[in-house]
């Protein structure tokens, strides 16, 4: 990406320091990443060096993605997007999800924020602490992977009692507004 620019695919001929964090400590994107030995060693998602980990709590990152008038979120919502799906929501800090939802609902009350959560999102534990996805300040709904798993289990075993139990667990655990909008 232009923000990290490890392969130097993006030019900084205007000298504004937009050549990416990998190429310059003066880059306005430098604080978005955590370098351990600049520039070649940095935190990456699951150790994959082509996926540098972004610091979603950095103020300038929050401004760029969420808060600024011309932020990524404002751009797409103003063009008619009605919401967003957060890939790998359990890898995002609570503060990021909460800030995103708060901003979306303030400007676009009918917008929807959906999270990719593979397990039961009502009691998800991620990195040692319970997530608050469905308590009103984060996600509107989630991908319904527990249901998918239950259906596959039924197709493999033919055990209707097991399927019924799994579906009932989802129904019992999810608030009605979430249950009625599962993906």
Which residues does each PLM region occupy?
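Active-site-proximal helices and loops of the catalytic beta/alpha 8
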Residues: 3-10, 14, 71-74, 82-182
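Substrate-binding/active-site clefts of carbohydrate-active enzymes
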Residues: 1-75, 106, 123
């Amino acid at each position: 990406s232009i923000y990290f620019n490890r392969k130097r695919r993006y030019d900084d001929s205007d000298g504004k320091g937009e050549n990416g964090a990998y190429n310059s400590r003066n880059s306005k994107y430098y604080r978005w990443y955590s370098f351990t030995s600049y520039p070649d060693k940095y935190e990456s998602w699951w150790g994959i060096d082509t996926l540098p980990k972004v610091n979603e709590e950095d103020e300038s990152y929050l401004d760029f993605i969420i808060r600024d008038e011309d932020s990524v979120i404002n751009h797409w919502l103003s063009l008619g997007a009605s919401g967003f799906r957060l890939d790998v929501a359990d890898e995002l800090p609570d503060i990021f999800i909460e800030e995103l939802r708060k901003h979306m609902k303030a400007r676009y009350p009918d917008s929807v924020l959906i999270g990719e959560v593979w397990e039961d999102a009502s009691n998800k534990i991620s990195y040692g602490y319970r997530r608050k996805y469905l308590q009103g300040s984060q996600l509107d709904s989630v991908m319904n992977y527990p249901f998918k798993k239950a259906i596959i289990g039924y197709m493999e075993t033919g055990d209707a009692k097991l399927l019924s139990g799994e579906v009932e667990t989802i129904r019992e655990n999810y608030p009605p507004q979430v249950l009625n909008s599962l993906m």
